[in-house]
Amino acid sequence: MKATELKDKSVEELNAELINLLREQFNLRMQHTTGQLEKTDQLRKVRRNIARVKTILTQKADA
């Protein structure tokens, strides 16, 4: 997910995306804890996507 794609979305869409990413992060953490997660780089990708969404939300709130 690129920041340019996120900038085109509305605040409601970004909030929905954030909720989905947080759920995905929770599921990945549970899989990692139980040893079922093979691709551990997914955790980092999701965490960075969450940061991207939060950054865009903050920018839109300030504007």
Swiss-Prot record:
A GO BP entry: translation
Pfam family, one: Ribosomal_L29
Matches recorded under CDD domains: Ribosomal_L29_HIP
Any GO molecular function: structural constituent of ribosome
GO cellular component, one term: cytosolic large ribosomal subunit
Superkingdom to which the source organism belongs: Bacteria
Keyword field: Ribonucleoprotein, Ribosomal protein
Family label: Belongs to the universal ribosomal protein uL29 family.
Stored PANTHER family: 60S RIBOSOMAL PROTEIN L35/50S RIBOSOMAL PROTEIN L29, LARGE RIBOSOMAL SUBUNIT PROTEIN UL29C
Name of protein: Large ribosomal subunit protein uL29
Gene that produces this protein: rpmC
